[in-house]
Amino acid sequence: MEIWYAEIINIGNEILTGRTINTNASHIARRLTSLGYTVRRITVVRDEIEEIVSAFREAINRRPRIIISTGGLGPTYDDKTNEGLAKALNIELELNEIAYKMLLEKYSKLNIEITEERKKMAIMPKGSIPVENNAGVAPGILIVYQGITILATPGVPKEMEDVLENFIKKYLKDRPSVKYLETSFLLEGVMESTIAPYVKQLVKKYDLYIKTHPKGQELSKPILEIQIAGSSENEAEIKERIQKALEELKEIGVKLGGTIIQS
């Protein structure tokens, strides 16, 4: 089974100072995983050109199928993703006419003039395709470089989600053939350390990702969410493996004195 790797780059000082929770990374990771990609790395960098350049170049050197970034596409002085991406790819920046028309249409409806700051949101690496942003103003930037699809999205979560979905629907034609499935259940009364060796055995037996997520306290009233996940080109086959592992894990949990409280 061929693995299609993906990487995520989040750009913004506000993430690194802890002011903003990085919900964008989790949303993109879930979305890409649902499409069959394996997200290999999530990188967070400051709003600094050299940091942005380094993040893109390092990701490109690892040769993922797709790189998605968030943040830095707005009109302010510290929005530098377009410049950083262009420098990382050694491609000149240009005023993208399609993106500029998108901006003109949005601002003209409100009788707002296009300033240099607003015009900046249409400046992209040469050869880029602007991706519509129906939840805001700044369009996403789509470019294919050395066979790697790169999508830069805004940092505002609603705008990022809109641009991401527009990209998936309109432009992401070549996708992994694998199907990712997962399920989970809650087990009460069994310590994570007690069930750990059984989980290890089942991971090897079924070739699945099985993860215990503690929801209670190990030494008082332990509650575990047990996640079972896997990928395969054969959906029926992966469903069967997950179901067998699920049933076996529940049996083990009960034998260890636990109670299934949610399945």
UniProtKB/Swiss-Prot annotation:
InterPro entries: CinA (IPR050101), CinA_Arc (IPR023055), MoaB/Mog-like_dom_sf (IPR036425), MoaB/Mog_dom (IPR001453). Gene3D superfamilies: MoaB/Mog-like domain (3.40.980.10). Pfam families: MoCF_biosynth. Coiled coil: none annotated. It comes from the Archaea. Belongs to the CinA family. HAMAP family: CinA_A. NCBIfam families: PRK01215.1. PANTHER family: NICOTINAMIDE-NUCLEOTIDE AMIDOHYDROLASE PNCC, NMN AMIDOHYDROLASE-LIKE PROTEIN YFAY. This is Protein STK_14130. The lineage of its organism: Archaea, Thermoproteota, Thermoprotei, Sulfolobales, Sulfolobaceae.
